[in-house]
Amino acid sequence: MDTKLLDILACPVCKGPLKLSADKTELISKGAGLAYPIRDGIPVMLESEARTLTTDERLDK
């Protein structure tokens, strides 16, 4: 996924910023507490496809 997209993409739930996960397989929304998967280089920005962040992930900066 092109990291330049992070400048223009926003979480569809809370409209907050997104962060690329360390392994580059998810876009993380701390505001919504969700992780959106990246499949074949394309972020899947659907709430129904996102997973809920764990407590540790929410607290991690």
Swiss-Prot record:
Disulfide bridge partners, by residue number: none
InterPro entries: Trm112-like
Cellular component terms per the entry's GO annotation: cytosol
Superkingdom of the source species: Bacteria
Family named by the database record: Belongs to the UPF0434 family.
Matching PANTHER family: PROTEIN PREY, MITOCHONDRIAL (PTHR33505:SF4), ZGC:162634 (PTHR33505)
Name used for this protein in its record: UPF0434 protein Pfl01_4174
